[in-house]
UniProtKB/Swiss-Prot annotation:
It is found in: Cytoplasm. Methylated by PrmC. Methylation increases the termination efficiency of RF1. GO terms for molecular function: translation release factor activity, codon specific. It holds the Pfam family RF-1. The gene is prfA. It comes from Bacillus licheniformis (strain ATCC 14580 / DSM 13 / JCM 2505 / CCUG 7422 / NBRC 12200 / NCIMB 9375 / NCTC 10341 / NRRL NRS-1264 / Gibson 46). This is Peptide chain release factor 1.
């Protein structure tokens, strides 16, 4: 571990030199690339330097015990040794986590797709609750939400809604939301007061850059049609809605949220690129992970990950056995307590795999 940390520190120092090189300063692409790499390494280097300093102090303190000391001084040195050993143990744990390979998609924006599943209109209303929850969470983080496509029902729910959240590290926080979300509550239309169970599925895709997914125009079929509102009625006499079909993979994306066909096509291309990138990522991950399961789930969108129980104001994340009696707060976007617990569990699982 120490050899690896030394090489990381050497690379960090080299990057500092490169970032002051006039040739790099005048090359925006290199400057951006090196700045990001330096930023990614900075925390590891800072913790490593604290670890090294504490180790040197511990060595000096142990050497002092070999000298002639009065009883008071000896006790002070022993106390210092004990404190330094605790600090080194804590820093070692931090370094182990920092050395876990980082998900290359973590810094990206995220495209989220929510669909009402089992439960009819109640599932569509729950999909609307989830969309609002993620929108509020994004707002609390200072991120921006942009709707790409929405299929609204007559009662204000969503059969499907696709939206992008733009913000540094958005994917790193929201990628754990992949899966089936279950709601237990009494529907407004239920006169008997019986609790119904409905589900909605959430898919989280990292936004893919053009350089990451090579899509040729000849591989895309473009269809245009008149956009429609709730219930399917036409709301636009112009052919502004766009449907893109990627012929090699069969991935289909529609967008009718904008009045302009050009803007709808741009939005649809972003979603198409993300879905194709995600498809390749899923295939590669499945091959790599055949015999491994993450503690927070496989990312399978059919996997039930969380239950929202309205009568008891309770949220349960089934992957880590976490239960919180704060449903009202969570639906207002206060998701950090759940997401932080998932990240800790995921890191512990990866650390265990790395050490096995």
């Amino acid at each position: 571990m120490l050899d690896r940390l030394k090489s990381i520190e050497d690379r960090y120092e080299k990057l500092n030199e490169l970032l002051s090189d006039p040739e790099v300063v005048n090359d925006p692409k290199k400057l951006r690339e090196y700045s990001k790499e330096q930023s990614d390494l900075q925390e590891t280097v800072e913790v490593y330097r604290r670890y090294r300093s504490a180790s040197e102090q511990l060595s000096d303190a142990k050497a002092m015990l070999e000298e002639k000391l009065d009883s008071d001084m000896r006790e002070m040195v022993k106390e210092e040794i004990s404190e330094l050993q605790e600090e080194i143990e804590s820093l070692t744990d931090q370094l182990k986590v920092l050395l876990i390979p980082k998900d290359p998609n973590d810094d990206k924006n995220v495209i989220m797709e929510i669909r009402g599943a089992a439960g009819g209109e109640e599932a569509a209303l729950f999909a609307g609750n989830l969309y609002r929850m993620y929108s509020r969470y994004a707002e609390l983080q200072g991120w921006k939400t942009e709707v790409m496509e929405a299929n609204m029902t007559g009662t204000g729910g969503y059969k499907e809604i696709i939206f992008m959240i733009n913000g540094n590290g958005a994917y790193s926080r929201l990628k754990y939301e992949n899966g089936a979300h279950r709601v237990q509550r009494v529907p407004e239309t239920e006169s008997g007061g019986r609790i119904h169970t409905s589900t909605a599925t959430v898919a989280c895709l990292p936004e893919a850059e053009e350089v990451e997914v090579d899509i040729h125009e000849k591989d895309i079929r473009v269809d245009t049609f008149a956009s429609s509102g709730p219930g399917g009625q036409s709301v636009n006499t112009t052919m502004s809605a766009v449907r893109l079909t990627h012929l090699p993979t069969g991935v289909v994306v529609s967008c009718q949220d904008e009045k302009s066909q050009i803007k709808n096509k741009e939005k649809a291309m972003k979603v198409l690129r993300a879905r194709i990138y995600d498809k390749f990522q899923q295939e590669a991950q499945a091959e790599y992970d055949q015999n491994r399961k993450s503690a927070v789930g496989t990312g399978d969108r059919s996997e039930r990950i969380r239950t929202y129980n309205f009568p008891q104001n309770r949220v349960t994340d089934h992957r880590i056995g976490l239960t919180i009696q704060k449903l009202d707060q969570i639906l207002e976007g206060k998701l950090d307590e759940v997401i932080d617990a998932l990240i800790v569990e995921d890191q512990a699982s990866k650390l265990q795999q790395a050490e096995s």
